Amino acid sequence: MAKEELLEMEGLVDEILPDSRYRITLDNGHKLIAYTAGRVKKNHIRILAGDKVSLEVSPYDLSKGRITFRHIDKKQSFAGAPYRRH
């Protein structure tokens, strides 16, 4: 399948499921299950319930998607030192 055929959508994370999967509600109200893209896993980007994310969805199966980007909430302020991995 070529990348041109994928649909780009945005949604909100409702629930975190086992095996790095998430239940997402799209902006149009449709619900689906999504997993994180390799780029997101590689960069250790944490996705929590309530986060706004961008997804790629195949036009052949609209019940599954891949999370490609987590949008940053401007209202959050990080007080103190940045998160460090040990």
Swiss-Prot record:
Could you give a GO molecular-function term held by this entry? rRNA binding
- List, alphabetically, the InterPro entries matched: NA-bd_OB-fold, RNA-binding_domain_S1_IF1, TIF_IF1
Kindly report the protein's main subcellular placement as a broad class: cytoplasm
A GO term from the CC aspect: cytosol
Q: Name one Pfam family in it.
A: eIF-1a
**Domain S1-like spans what residues?**
1-72
Q: Does the keyword Protein biosynthesis apply?
A: yes
UniProt keyword terms in alphabetical order: Cytoplasm, Initiation factor, Protein biosynthesis, RNA-binding, rRNA-binding
Subcellular location as annotated: Cytoplasm
User: Function of this protein?
Assistant: One of the essential components for the initiation of protein synthesis. Stabilizes the binding of IF-2 and IF-3 on the 30S subunit to which N-formylmethionyl-tRNA(fMet) subsequently binds. Helps modulate mRNA selection, yielding the 30S pre-initiation complex (PIC). Upon addition of the 50S ribosomal subunit IF-1, IF-2 and IF-3 are released leaving the mature 70S translation initiation complex.
- Family, per the entry? Belongs to the IF-1 family.
**What binding partners and quaternary form does the record give?**
Component of the 30S ribosomal translation pre-initiation complex which assembles on the 30S ribosome in the order IF-2 and IF-3, IF-1 and N-formylmethionyl-tRNA(fMet); mRNA recruitment can occur at any time during PIC assembly.
List the HAMAP family hit by this protein, alphabetically. IF_1
Protein name from the UniProt record: Translation initiation factor IF-1 2
Gene name of the encoded protein: infA2
